Every structure is written in structure tokens, then in C-alpha cells.
């Protein structure tokens, strides 16, 4: 019996693991050759930053991906007060990315225009009554009369320079930049597009 004790303990442990991951009881270590299947984690709902560019989650809605792609066109542009507020049209959307710089609401507007959530740029005060109140599941604009930023797919798109937690974010300069860390929403109104 003492020689079989390690085998019995291993089988019991494998059975517990199988039950924990939802496998049928018959799928023990003995029936699977000593291994137990553990399913992969679900796909991430959070975008990733690679060399300053956001990579959208695979399962993100198409319009969310389009908003991220539009924002990627202006990332690394400098901060310019009033930048990004030229009226948009589908034909000049890419040309608008060639503005010399963007301010906070111009940055948010350009990303949202890319995802077909806006038809023309808004200033930060106008965003306070845009769309629906509260946090969205994919996109949330945080705004007050003096500043606006947006969180898309879990990443913050912001132009401000003083709240960066990571050293690489502090070195990135002012202007449209993706941030992996959120900032405090205190003093901001949260708005989101319906269904997003």
C-alpha cells in the first residue's frame, strides 16, 4: 500500500483539478495519461501598446478597432491648442491626420470620428453632453470644461503630460499618446456611445 500512496494522491489531485476546470469526472489523470486539460484564458478585452501604437483586442467591435486605428494615425503628434478641430469629411479623414498637432478634444474627436461615433469635432465642454452618461463597455470619454480624454479598449488616449506613472510614459512628451494607466476621473464627466 505505501508504494501506491503517491499514485493515489496524484490521481486524487488530478481529479480535483479536472472538476475545478469543468471536465467530466471520467477525465482523471488515469484516463488522460496523467495530464489534465486546462482551457486557455479568454481573449483580452484590453488593447495593448506596442512601440506607442495601440493594438486592438481581436474580439473588439469593428467600430472600436476603427477608432483605435484612427487614433494611431495621430499618436506622437505634438500638442497644439485648437489642433484637430478642422471639420471632417470621409474624404479628408486621413488628411486631417496630417495636422501639425492636436489638443485634447481634437484628439478625442479624431479617434471617435474614425470609429463613426462623431461627424465633426467637439470641444471638451461639448463632450459633457455628448452621447450617453456613464462609463461604456468599450469607449468612455472623460471630460470637463477644460480637458477631455478617452479610454478605448482599456487604454487611455490623452494629451496631458503630468500624470504618467511609467517612466516610458513620462518621456513620451505632450500630445496624443496611448497610456496603459488610467488617471483619476474625479472632476470629469463620463460619457459613452450607445452600445459601446
Q: Which residues make up each language-model segment?
A:
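Residue-level detector of bioactive/disordered segments in secreted/extracellular proteins
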Residues: 13, 18-19, 106
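C-terminal segment of classical bacterial N-terminal signal peptides
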Residues: 17-27
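Bacterial N-terminal signal peptides that target proteins for export
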Residues: 1-12
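N-terminal capping segments
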Residues: 30-105, 113-115, 136-137, 142-145, ...
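Solvent-exposed, flexible loop/coil residues
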Residues: 5, 83-85, 126, 131
Amino acid at each position: 500500500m505505501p508504494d501506491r500512496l503517491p499514485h493515489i494522491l496524484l490521481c486524487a489531485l488530478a481529479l480535483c483539478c479536472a472538476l475545478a476546470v469543468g471536465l467530466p469526472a471520467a477525465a482523471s489523470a488515469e484516463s488522460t495519461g496523467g495530464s489534465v486539460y486546462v482551457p486557455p484564458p479568454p481573449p483580452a478585452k484590453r488593447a495593448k501598446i506596442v512601440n506607442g501604437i495601440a493594438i486592438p483586442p481581436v474580439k473588439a467591435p469593428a467600430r472600436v478597432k476603427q477608432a483605435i486605428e484612427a487614433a494611431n494615425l495621430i499618436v506622437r503628434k505634438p500638442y497644439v491648442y485648437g489642433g484637430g478641430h478642422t471639420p471632417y469629411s470621409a474624404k479628408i479623414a486621413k488628411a486631417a491626420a496630417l495636422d501639425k498637432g492636436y489638443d485634447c478634444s481634437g484628439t478625442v474627436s479624431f479617434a471617435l470620428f474614425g470609429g463613426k461615433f462623431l461627424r465633426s469635432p467637439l470641444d471638451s465642454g461639448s463632450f459633457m453632453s455628448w452621447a450617453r452618461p456613464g462609463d461604456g463597455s468599450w469607449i468612455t470619454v472623460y471630460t470637463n470644461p477644460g480637458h477631455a480624454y478617452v479610454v478605448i479598449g482599456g487604454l487611455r488616449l490623452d494629451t496631458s503630460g503630468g500624470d504618467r506613472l511609467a517612466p516610458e510614459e513620462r518621456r513620451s512628451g505632450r500630445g496624443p499618446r496611448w497610456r496603459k494607466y488610467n488617471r483619476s476621473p474625479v472632476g470629469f464627466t463620463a460619457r459613452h456611445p450607445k452600445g459601446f
